């Protein structure tokens, strides 16, 4: 296990070093209420469930579990919705949010072209 800050996650997303929607992932389905509750949890300092990511042989990552949360965080960072206080991200001093630490479980060196990542996704689903 390791930790990433939200700032580091955003950097991975923007550099296209992590794929939030590999082919086996469902579409983004969280409601606005779900999204606001997640952001509220971050501002309150509550721990979030682990994010599971695969590190492919090419050094890039795939989000196996945590796509809804990661997408919500990125959408909020880009001021696509307001939080429970009816404010956009840009209306706050950013450091508290960006320095929030996410727990990451990294599963290494898979070859997604062989479908191995889908097997890992199945295992993650079984543990829920």
What are these regions, as identified by a protein language model?
Residues 1-9, 18-128:
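Basic- and aromatic-enriched surface patches that contact anionic nucleotides/nucleic acids
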